[in-house]
From Swiss-Prot:
Enzyme class: transferase
Family to which this protein belongs: Belongs to the archaeal Rpo3/eukaryotic RPB3 RNA polymerase subunit family.
Pfam families: RNA_pol_A_bac, RNA_pol_L
GO CC list: cytoplasm; DNA-directed RNA polymerase complex
Protein name: DNA-directed RNA polymerase subunit Rpo3
The reaction(s) this protein catalyses: RNA(n) + a ribonucleoside 5'-triphosphate = RNA(n+1) + diphosphate
Upper classification of the organism: Archaea, Thermoproteota, Thermoprotei, Thermoproteales, Thermoproteaceae
PROSITE patterns cross-referenced by the UniProt entry: RNA_POL_D_30KD
Amino acid sequence: MARATVVERGEYFLKAVVEGVPPSLVNSLRRVIISELPVMAIDNVVVVNNTSVMYDEMLAHRLGLIPLTTPLQSLPPYEDCVSGLADPSECSTRLTLQVTAEGDTTIYSGDLASDRPDVVPVYKDIPIVKLVKGQSIVLEAYAKLGVAKDHAKWQAATASYYYYPKVVVKSENCREMCKEICRQLENPIECSFNKAWTCKDLCKEGLEVTWDKNKYVFWVESFGNYDVNTALREAFRILKRKFAVFAEELFRRASVETKV
């Protein structure tokens, strides 16, 4: 029976023990989280004036990598934005920056003003560029929904998993030898499979390390665009849609071959 037990969680982080499912399904979820969760990111920049020491291209690149809050509940599905079913204006927004330095100053991500109050920089203290007295920057930046398989600036989260390790300590000396690597050898949450195997190399026959092929420690961490609950909910929605599209195409082709 498939089951997931949460062992650690926060607003943007979750670690769980997953069991009763094949590794292909767990890996599919991991891949969707990493590369197919939609988030807002700056994609086009119109520079009106830039007298700083930074080239326009580098400035635009930095702006693109600033994570933006993404209210998925009030945005159209990403697939509708790509297909044209949704109004393009609902899938994008504008941010502006207009600064003239009165002295030595640093421009931060928090200085960007957004047309949408729910799409703003996640972190306000990301440095963009330094200005000296008299220098100025005036620009418009246009953010849109995207996914990380197209560009890393649209990556919403990272995820990983490892097989649930089964560790048997046969020598107490092994605990002392491994205390710097893993203090709780028999705790698979605190001691990952890789750490346990490193200890195995030290302890030799004093430690037995195997794994459960249908049990995993899975973790996901959001970059702040939205919380981990939203990330998982969207990942499962995308995964279900992929299964539905695959099944529909499979049945269609099977039907065509049967008629022939």
